[in-house]
Amino acid sequence: MDNKCFELGANEQPLDIIKETCGFAGIFKQIGVIGDSLASGEFESHDENGSIVYTDMYEYSWPAVLERITGTKYNNYSRGGMTAREYMQSWADANGFWQWNQAYIIALGNNDSFVCGHPLGSVKDVNAECPQDNADTFFGNMGKIVCKLKTIEPNARIFVVTPQLRGEACDKDIRYIASELAKLCDMFDFTYLLDMTAHAPVYDAEMRK
C-alpha cells in the first residue's frame, strides 16, 4: 500500500485539496451537528405579503450533503439563529438533542455576539471539571456544551468550527473567537479546531448573495 496518499504536501493548507468523496469524513458512522442557519440549510424567501421568511431546509444543508456522499448518518440539531446560550439552556433539552453520537461538530458563534449581544467572555469562563460554575458567556456555554457531550460519550471526537471572516469591522472579534476556541479545544481530549477563520473564503456581502 502506498502511504504517500496520507502525507501532507509541502506548505499544504487544509482546503487546498477537496476530494469529491470527502476523504476521511466517512470514517465515522454517526455525527451530531450543533449549529445555526449555516448548518441548518436555512433559506430566505418572501411570503404572499412580501415579507422576508427564513426556513430551515435541512435536506439542503451541508450535513445532509455529506450524509449522501459518505453514507455517515448526520443528526442535525441546528436551527437558524441558534446561540451557545440557547442551545445549552433550552433548545437541546426541549428537543431531546442530548443524544449519543460517535462524533460532534459544533459550529456556533455567528449569532451570539453579533446578533444577540451575548458577552463573549473567554476560556477563563470554562471550568472543565465543574461546568455548572461556568460563566453565562459564549465561551462559558460552549464549555458546558462540550462537557455535556463528553458525559454522553467520553471518547467522542468533537470538532469545533470557527466563524468565517466577513470583511467587516467584526473581523477583529471573529479572530478573537477563533483564538479562544483553539484554547478551548486544548482543554478537552479528542477535541479539534476546524479553523474556518484562517482557511475559508471571506463570508462577505458578495458571497452571501
Region spans (language model):
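N-terminal secretory targeting modules
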Residues: 1-58, 67-68, 97-100, 151-154
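A generic structural signal for well-ordered alpha-helical segments
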Residues: 66-67, 149, 184-186
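Conserved SGNH/GDSL esterase-like catalytic core that processes O-acyl groups on lipids
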Residues: 30, 41-140
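Active-site-proximal beta-strand/loop segments in catalytic clefts of secreted hydrolases
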Residues: 34-37, 77-82, 107-110, 161-165, ...
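Generic structural signal for well-ordered alpha-helices
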Residues: 142-146, 178
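Conserved, well-ordered alpha-helix/loop/beta-strand core segments that scaffold catalytic motifs
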Residues: 107-109, 159, 174, 190
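Catalytic His-Asp segment of secreted/periplasmic serine-dependent ester chemistry enzymes
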Residues: 164-209
